[in-house]
Amino acid sequence: MARVGRVGFLTLAVVFHLMYAYSIFDIYFVSPIVSGMRSFGVEREASAEAPAKRLVLFVADGLRADKAFQALPDPDAPSDLENDEPIYLAPFIRSRALSHGTFGISHTRVPTESRPGHVALIAGLYEDVSAVTTGWKLNPVDFDSVFNRSRHTWSWGSPDILPMFKEGAVPGRIDADTYGEEAEDFSADATKLDIWVFDKVKELFASAKKDPELDAKLREDKLVFFLHLLGLDTTGHAYRPYSKEYLRNIKLVDKGVQEITQLVEDFYGDGKTSFVFTADHGMSDWGSHGDGHPDNTRTPLVVWGSGVASPRYTHEGTITGHEDGVSADWGLDSVQRNDVAQADVAALMAYLVGLDFPTNSVGQLPLGYLDTSPKDKALAALANAQGVLEMYRVKEEQKRDALLRYTPFEPLADNGETSVEARLERIKTLISNKSYDASIQLSSELLLTALEGLRYLQTYDWLFLRTIVSLGYLGWIAYALTTVIDLHVLHGKSESNRTTFSIMFFSSILVALFSVLLYQGSSWRYYLYALFPIFFWEEVFARRKALLAGREILLGHVHSVSGYFAFAIQLLLYVGVLEALVQSYFHRDIFTVCFILGGFWPITYGTKFLGQHKLLSASWALGCFLMSIFTLLPANKVEDMMMISCGSLLMFLTGLLYLIFERSILGQKRSSDPNSVVSSCGSRTIMGAQVGMILLALIVTRSSVASLQAKQGLPLGNQVLGWAILVSSLLLPFLHRLYPNSHYLHRLMVIFLTFSPIFIILTISYEGLFYFVFCMTLLAWVRLEQAIYIHTTAPTREQDHSVANGSLPAKKPSPGNTVVVEGQPYRYRTLSVSDARVALFFFFLLQSGFFSTGNIASVSSFSLDSVYRLIPIFNPFAQGALLILKLLIPFAIISANLGILNHRLEVAPSALFMVVMSISDVMTLNFFYMVRDEGSWLEIGTTISHFCIASFLCTFVAVLEFLSELFISGVDFGHPATTVGSAVAKAVNGSVACGHSPDSDISGEDSTSVGITAKADPDARS
């Protein structure tokens, strides 16, 4: 096929990585939802009633198990009270656990978000991990649930949760009464949300006394009442779960639950109501959730009322459920703790109210919560197992029909006495013989085996898909390296060399794969997964001569064994850095070690180099030392106005000092040209406005923080002004086009000032300090790289030594390497092995731009405190966009610096970016095999996050390539025909204009950027 150019390569990189980033969800997290199953319920005699006629479900959104049961300081106690003894904040719920019902911990799965949590509670189903985003908009639950099985369900609460169950159920079966989205204000008192729910329930029963039709409807059986209490989640996000506001909200919820319980009991008076109190997820100490931290996965479960077992008091030497020590300080050691998986709650509710188990439920009925006869327990356990077996049967039929060859799950295969039918008959026989305990044991074993079978079917295609994806990533690495060599080492002079055999070979593999996928009815994504590795490896094979020619150019200088050994050591070192970056995803302090070592990097170029560039080397070392500190600081931060102010003042002073000493910094003399004077004044005025915007952003942020911390809400004026600053700071730089200053330092300062106000508004702690240090370090890096480039291209003994040891320095542009830019010849030099080190530095700094202020065990590491200053109302897409904007700012800064570095190292604009994209998937492939879908939920969430971020960062490099061109558009690097390569010419030929030393544009003024240029010898040889 035709050779891909720069745009084609970058586009292919984006498409490939976006597709393959999704591959983990097709491999590890396929939706477990299937349809076509019959439902199963407990077989009762015609005259027998269900344990309860109705069920009331309380879900305290975001309530941690420990906060529900621990003794904690009274949030309403006077501050001057001497005897501030801890109290139990939920005495009524606690009394249900101690005297009236059964309690335990409900263990949730990741992602610990509201939609997956409610789906598990109400449908008994764990949605695939990617379903978390569907909770941010109306996306009906299109599978069976307890609500859908009920005769009627009344629900009250959040507009984010209730509609998805109502819209996905049988029409008219669910009533959903919600407050408006504007009520979810993080800056307001969130307890009003729970009060609203309790009041609405009271209104319903009050209306029934006046409405006979409603009264009759309420007295039917198989009814469910669902109270979604969002106050704790909203309060926890805003104030943290250890705050007085959160603790006060627990007291309010407990009081409300008590009132509703009493109201229902008084209304019916028949004692046939079951009550379930639980939470969809917990909350970390930082007010976040989403990952698998135990604070997020442990939620309270208290069940009482009709059909529920009374507390089982523990005795010494017996199993109490408290052995793990989690509940040691809850004061509940006297009663047994019965832990469940979150999906088990759906099975429990269905049993209590006499419903069939939801057809997609994988929950195991917790028999310890039931107050019923052994026979009923045995029948319930059997029905529970039959429901899960039915789901396995349907999924197996679908898998068998789709595959060319299917290998059944051995424990559930049709093998005579061990067949499913034989086991079910044995269980029924045991029940008939009143051997209830034995039948329950067999039912439990059969259910667990069915779950293992579902797991087997879920992972059936793993080997096939993982092999294809692995070959795809390896193929991309090989293809990208081949393309880099073809475009930037051989300059497109190599030709493809396809043979008839190779065409037939790769085509046959592709046809075979597509045929299998077509027969199996696979998703369209599978075809792309298969297409990419075939395409990449075919291209690599076709351009194998380019690889050989590139090897001659890049390593042709290496002839001795010691040279090859030195090159091998260098290669291993690069791979070691990439593997260190992999580990840095788990241990941020690896960045600290790397930065400290990197600070000494200039020493490797000898004492002469250090002597010529003392200030520059010191600046780089200082930047590295300061950067090493940030990854030692906690990733989870609390709001610190002092840190915000310090970072803001550093940004302000940087801009102010630049305005004062601009001419000295740029090495420009005062001009007498009227047009130049006007342009200079205009540019300085605009930059002055940018500097002033920083100060204004600090003032507004301090005011907003003070108001929010005082619980006075976000003033409208602050919100409007905050948005005005954010938008205007992004628009102001465009005014510089009216009064252009093309010096690269000026351009970098404009970009720095552009993002400073945004960073101030969206920072909560030390991020502003990081932004300042990061920009300073990048500038030192750009100037240091150019100094090294000039140093290593000079024909010195140091250069000869580096060649002998296998490290070929960069060469200055040769006359043949010419492209046309704006109608003029522009020469780029050939890439060398040493440029891989520059690309690796860029990739390291790119990663540090993300990790220095956070980690990615989960996205929830990033606090929402800052976005409350702009959007106090719950709006996940808008708030998420602001957080992403904050995360992307360092990437924008580094793209501008690399764009300038490309020019100053005289390489093609896309060259270094392409090298980065060639090597970065070494990390991505590591994380692909680290992804887990079982084990601790913290590990699962972490591995997903790691793979996705690594893959998206690689994709983002392609975007940065285009962004860098935008940022440096119009920057003056001198006349293309004369100044490209002038720095090298000065070092090689010694012909320096205006009396500057060869390094003057590095350590002092930048001569090539302000028109003080040297004549490059057009015939100079590399």
From Swiss-Prot:
Keywords: Cell wall biogenesis/degradation, Endoplasmic reticulum, Glycoprotein, GPI-anchor biosynthesis, Membrane, Transferase, Transmembrane, Transmembrane helix
Molecular function GO terms recorded: mannose-ethanolamine phosphotransferase activity
GO biological process, one term: cell wall organization
Lumenal side: 28-466, 520-560, 611-614, 662-685, 735-749, 792-837, 902-910, 969-1022
Cytoplasmic side: 1-6, 488-498, 582-589, 636-640, 707-713, 859-880, 932-947
Record's subcellular location: Endoplasmic reticulum membrane
Keyword Glycoprotein on entry: yes
Topology in the lipid bilayer: Multi-pass membrane protein
Pfam families from the UniProt entry: Phosphodiest, PigN
Glycosylation positions in this chain: N148, N433, N805, N989
Region annotation (Disordered) ranges: 998-1022
Function statement: Ethanolamine phosphate transferase involved in glycosylphosphatidylinositol-anchor biosynthesis. Transfers ethanolamine phosphate to the first alpha-1,4-linked mannose of the glycosylphosphatidylinositol precursor of GPI-anchor.
Protein name from the UniProt record: GPI ethanolamine phosphate transferase 1
Organism for this UniProt entry: Aspergillus oryzae (strain ATCC 42149 / RIB 40) (Yellow koji mold)
Gene it is expressed from: mcd4
